[in-house]
C-alpha cells in the first residue's frame, strides 16, 4: 500500500465530512427559516383576527327592513316555521368534518344556488305568517359569496325582516383546506309589521384565542304589535351552541329562560324557536337512538326548569336534523343518525293548534323545517 495514497484518501475523507456538515447546516438553517416564517405568519394572522374580531354589544338595536300590511289581533291564528338552512351547502350530498365527515367545502356555487331556490320555494309553499331561519350566509367562502338573505327576502312579498349576525370572521384558519371568510347569522321574516328588532348576546363558552374564530351566539327579538291591545307578539329566533362541552348550552339556555320569562311577565305573547342543538325532556326521542358514541350527540333541555308559563313544542314523528358524518344520498335511511333538536317554546296564552316537521328528505339542508300553528288567546 502506498503511504501517499493513504494520506490523500484521509484528506478526502475529512473534506467530505466538512462538506456534509456544511450541507446539514445549510438545511437546518433553511428549515429554521421556514419555521420562523411560518410562526411569524401565524402570529400575524392571530393579530389580524384579534384586531378584527367580531365583538357585539350585549344588546344591539337592529334594522327592520321591508314593508308589511298585515295587522294582528287577539284571537287570530298565527303560523310560523323554523328552519336551519345550512347556509345552502348542506344538502343530501354533503358530509362535514365537524360531524365526522371528510369535507369542508360541501357544495359548488351552482349547488348553493339550487338549494337556496328550493328552500325559498318550500317557504312559499308553506305560506307561514313568519319564519325563523338559521345559518343564513351574507358573504362566506363556503357559500361562494352568495347573499342568501337577499335571495330569500326577494321571494317574500309584503313582509318585514331582520337579521342578526352570529358568525363573522375575516378568515377561519382551520382545517385544511380552511373554512376561510364567514359572514353568517339568523334571519326572521314576517307578514306582519315588526316594530323593532334587538340582538341579545348569549354567553360564549370559548376563551381566547379560539374565541376569535368562533361563533358569537345570540337571540334576535322582534316585536309585532297586537291591535286594540297593550300586548305584543314577541318572536325570538335562536341558534344555540353545538360543539362545546355542554356548559355553553346550559348557560345560553338559562339566559334564554330569563328573556322569555321577562316577556311573559309583561303579559306578552311569546314564541321562541330555532335550532336548540338540544332535545326537549318532554318529548319522546327513543325512535332516534344514538347509534354510535363517535358521532355528535345533542344535549337536553329540562323543560321543568322553565315553569308552567312556557311550553315546549316539536313534532317527533319526523326527525328535524340528520348527522353529517356521511352524505344522505346513497345511504341506508334505516341505519342513519337522526336528531330532534328544532322546535319552539310558546307562552301559555297561546293555544298550539298543530306542529309538523316537513319531511323533505334533507334534500337541500341537513335540517327539516318545522311548522307550527297557534291561536292568540283573548
Residue ranges and their predicted role:
Residues 2-13:
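Positively charged N-terminal leader segments that act as targeting/secretion signals
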Residues 17-150, 154-155, 163-174, 178-183, ...:
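N-terminal, active-site-proximal structural segment of metallo-dependent hydrolase catalytic domains
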Residues 79-85, 116-145, 189, 222-224, ...:
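Active-site beta-strand/loop signature of hydrolases that rely on acidic residues for catalysis
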Residues 87-88, 137-140, 166-170, 194-195, ...:
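Solvent-exposed loop/turn segments at secondary-structure junctions
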Residues 102-108, 136-138, 203-211, 239-247:
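Surface-exposed cleft-lining segments at the edges of enzyme active sites
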Residues 154-157, 181-197, 223-225, 332-351, ...:
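Conserved beta strand-loop-helix elements of the APE1-like EEP
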Residues 168-233, 237:
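A well-ordered secondary-structure block
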Residues 244-348:
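Metal-dependent phosphoesterases centered on the DNase I-like endonuclease/exonuclease/phosphatase
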